[in-house]
Amino acid sequence: MKIVCNGKDNTMFKKNHVVRLVLIFTLIMGVSSLAVMLGGTMRARNNSYITIDPETIELVQLNAPKEGDPIAVVDTSLGEYRFVLYPQYSPNAVANFTELANSGYYNNTYVFHSESGVYSASGAPNKDGSANDSSHELVERELNQNLWPFKGAVCVMTTTLKQSFKEKCFGGGTYYNGSRFLTLNTVSFDEDFQKELRESSESEALAEAFIKHGGVPNFSQQMTVIGQTYSGMDVVEKLASLETNNAGIYKFPKEDVIIKSVTIGTYSEKDEDTGKK
């Protein structure tokens, strides 16, 4: 028996209600799927911080410094190393570093981390690796396809990531770096790693440069490179291979290693030959 309510067939009412629910559910699922797809696309887009064109990469770090190039001379308690600066590629980070060096900020700061022969971290006024204030710690990260984490590269450390609500949901954000810096030595390039690097790199020249010169490929396009060591590589190697005490995120040297000073100048072949700064 059919029940008639207000002159309408209740069976038909139930069928229409079910159909409506199915349509609503389908619409919700469609919107959800679209949101997931868009979210994945946005994540991919936002995580691709820089577009690399293998045809136009210039591996400038493999070139010797030229007369008049800006340089930094880092005098440590273990010796001195020198690197050429790249203001044309990382203008804001180089300006921040240069300003701090010229002000004497780096005088008697600490090498506060030494990572198993791979790299060292320097430039902290405190033994625990912290900075005294944030006034020079919010420089937007600058990436460039011509700068890579080869052995001897100097990179400024990432300090923070700022994200909007949308970026927290879908990925992306703005990375910042500051005063402290890494000086890279190298990871080990065994045969398997060399093969993997050659197969995964879009640029044959870049892969071969890492294999020949060393470096830390997994840091590629992850932090701002400001310079490339051209003198004192033995000091770079020592700084990366210190005996350490593990304490939280840092491996502190067992014995204090000090950055006595960082001097900004210009490259002169004559000065290099005579040992002048």
Regions found by a protein language model. Name each.
Residues 3-277:
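Cyclophilin-like peptidyl-prolyl cis-trans isomerases
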